[in-house]
Amino acid sequence: DAKDLGVDMFLLDDGWFANKYPRKDDRAGLGDWEPTRSKLPGGIPALTKAAEEAGVKFGLWIEPEMVNPKSELYEKHRNWVIELPNRETYYYRHQLVLDLSNPEVQDYVYGVVDRLMTENPNIVYFKWDCNSPITNIYSPYQKANQGNLYIEYVRGLYKVLDRIQAKYPKLEMMLC
């Protein structure tokens, strides 16, 4: 029994998401934040229920600032990616950074957490990962204002985190 061993939380880490391009390694799925039906037929609700029945809390890994080129999000919103035009793209861990200077991207990233929390109110913790530095420095949104990209990116991230904290003040998050 997990609780008898001193376990107080079950954290579902990387690999639980995406259906068109299911996450099986670091080459696909980032950006498509729905449970992989073939891996989790009961979705996240079945896991939160099992955790509750075991007397432990439930946490979830996400990396919402990133996207794999092999994802539905990238196919639909390539213009949301920080990427130099007319240059060969550099991939760090087969992923790219979403442009959080763009309010549409901020809404999307907030929506990832909001949807997961709405559908799974028993989530008490997010491990918010960020496994790539910003490379390919160019924002389609900033256009002529490229010199402010880093600053506007961080401001955008803070706006997202402020919105999450305002709606879910008891939700714990570790940003790493």
Language-model region placement:
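Aromatic-lined carbohydrate-recognition surfaces of secreted/lumenal glycan-active proteins
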Residues: 11, 54-69, 154-176
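Aromatic-lined carbohydrate-binding/catalytic grooves of carbohydrate-active enzymes
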Residues: 1-111, 120, 124-125, 142
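Active-site-proximal structural scaffolding
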Residues: 3, 40, 44, 51, ...
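Conserved N-terminal glycine/acidic-rich loop preference
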Residues: 84-90, 94-95, 101-105, 113-116, ...
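Short, loop-centered acidic/histidine patches that primarily coordinate divalent metals
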Residues: 15, 131, 176
